Amino acid sequence: MSFGIDDLPVRDELRGKSPYGAPQLDVPVRLNTNENPYPLPEPLVERIAERVREAARHLNRYPDRDAVELRTELATYLTNTGKHPVGIENVWAANGSNEVIQQLLQTFGGPGRTAIGFEPSYSMHALIARGTGTAWISGPRGEDFTIDLAAARQAIAESRPDVVFITTPNNPTGTAVPPETVLALYEAAQAVKPSMVVVDEAYIEFSHGDSLLPLLEGRPHLVVSRTMSKAFGAAGLRLGYLAAHPAVVDAVQLVRLPYHLSAITQATALAALEHTDTLLGYVEQLKAERDRLVAELRAIGYDVTESDANFVQFGRFADAHEVWQQILDRGVLVRDNGVPGWLRVSAGTPEENDAFLDAVRELKKEQNA
């Protein structure tokens, strides 16, 4: 007699759902998870080893519960790059931006509360909402994947959400949200109740525009979420962080697990922050490759969404999954992200991008034959 998940007393809202995950396939070129394709530079690897070696001497003790040194350095990074002064009291860090989002929803969402996001957008927002017992509301986007301000305001007024998610640059479309739109949505949310507005800036270092950190001034219900997985090329580190009013930082600590950031994680992140200039140099290379992908895909004849991230959404396809498979058959893995008619490709190294472009050129020739 077989026994499966349906035989367990799983919460009703989790039944029939699937866990988050992109395919992990062994192919020559993997451009499906928006990772930074460049390995960490050797001087940084050596510095990580030094810091981890020092931390290892004290692993018999719990790590710094409040990650004071790390939060101080993150605040310095945000101040230097975000055109807005940020102090340690404004910063909180966790195991990836997903844990940051989880802690925010545990604090401000939960049973009997709601969260709204404007989809298609980062699917983990909805998944984490369900995991925390927060009812999820799918807000509208326009045909061009931008946020229709009038429709979004109406959705907020009707649903009265406790948490509002705005992802900019947006994943999976790559589109940025103008500051004036974010401000308008913040004001719309505050007009109905004291809602928390979370701006997810996971890809902001790749944007043509600036961070929205300056909007934090005078807006205690606004949160900016970040990650070290993308621009810092440290997806394996799992380090996310937020900037917000000090009261928000105090609030999320009500739900954090004790000593949630390991000494090894803190040591590694601190080493990476010492090499910010080098790592952001790779970001400039990836931005150039992203722009090249946009131009080349349009020249080949595909529709391409404007991108402010390290990936490009392209289409349109009658059967996107079939095209995904045809690209995979040519040794290149891209992402079928569930947006009907569209696929997403991460910006890789020039050689990886050439392999991808060769594959889609070949496909286009076959389609036109």
Swiss-Prot record:
CDD domains in the record: AAT_like (cd00609)
Pfam family, one: Aminotran_1_2
InterPro entries associated with the record: Aminotrans_II_pyridoxalP_BS, Aminotransferase_I/II_large, HisP_aminotrans, PyrdxlP-dep_Trfase, PyrdxlP-dep_Trfase_major, PyrdxlP-dep_Trfase_small
Protein name: Histidinol-phosphate aminotransferase
Modified residues (N6-(pyridoxal phosphate)lysine): K230
Catalysis: reaction(s): L-histidinol phosphate + 2-oxoglutarate = 3-(imidazol-4-yl)-2-oxopropyl phosphate + L-glutamate
Gene coding for it: hisC
Keywords, alphabetical: Amino-acid biosynthesis, Aminotransferase, Histidine biosynthesis, Pyridoxal phosphate, Transferase
Region (Disordered): 1-39
PROSITE patterns (UniProt xref): AA_TRANSFER_CLASS_2 (PS00599)
EC number from the UniProt entry: 2.6.1.9
GO MF entries: histidinol-phosphate transaminase activity; pyridoxal phosphate binding
Pathway linked to the protein: Amino-acid biosynthesis; L-histidine biosynthesis; L-histidine from 5-phospho-alpha-D-ribose 1-diphosphate: step 7/9
Swiss-Prot/TrEMBL cofactor(s): pyridoxal 5'-phosphate
Region forming the signal peptide: none
Keyword Amino-acid biosynthesis: yes
Subunit structure: Homodimer.
Entry-linked Gene3D superfamilies: Aspartate Aminotransferase, domain 1 (3.90.1150.10), Type I PLP-dependent aspartate aminotransferase-like (Major domain) (3.40.640.10)
Protein family: Belongs to the class-II pyridoxal-phosphate-dependent aminotransferase family. Histidinol-phosphate aminotransferase subfamily.
Domain of life: Bacteria
GO BP of this protein: L-histidine biosynthetic process
